[in-house]
């Protein structure tokens, strides 16, 4: 099984949609143990702002806030339910049969 890294683009605890998105990721991450790492990219802090800028340059536009990047790619620009996130992660962790598969 492939290991994946999730980044939650997060404005801060005052952003209720950001908080909810992080809670969904935190809940789901428990199911995957060492196969999944995740972090909040808090854009109001220097380190998070730098990563936000990297993602913006890589993808040619500002990332949505909140959003979920998996292995550096925008996967969700709205908060998914836990079951939907699990389904996408399960597919992403399997050996790829079709490199053009979209989620």
Language-model segments: residues:
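N-terminal leader/targeting and pre-domain segments
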Residues: 1-4, 97, 101-103
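Local sequence-structure signature of Cys/Sec-based thiol-disulfide redox active-site neighborhoods
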Residues: 1-32
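Generic structural signal for residues in well-ordered beta-strands
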Residues: 6, 38-40
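Short histidine/acidic/glycine/proline-rich micro-motifs that form metal-
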Residues: 11-15, 42-43, 75
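Generic recognition of short, well-ordered alpha-helical segments
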Residues: 19-23, 50, 80
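Thioredoxin-like thiol-disulfide oxidoreductase module
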Residues: 41-63
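Conserved beta-strand/loop subsegment of P-loop NTPase cores
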Residues: 67
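Non-catalytic, surface beta->alpha helical segment in thiol-disulfide oxidoreductase systems
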Residues: 70-100
């Amino acid at each position: 099984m492939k290991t994946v890294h999730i980044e939650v683009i997060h404005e801060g605890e005052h952003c209720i949609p950001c908080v909810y998105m992080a809670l969904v990721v935190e809940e789901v991450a428990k199911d995957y143990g060492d196969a999944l790492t995740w972090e909040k990219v808090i854009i109001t802090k220097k380190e998070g702002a730098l990563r936000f800028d990297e993602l913006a340059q890589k993808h040619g536009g500002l990332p949505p806030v909140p959003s979920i990047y998996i292995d550096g790619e925008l996967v969700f620009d709205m908060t998914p339910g836990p079951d939907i996130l699990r389904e996408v992660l399960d597919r992403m962790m399997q050996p790829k049969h079709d490199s053009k598969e979209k989620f």
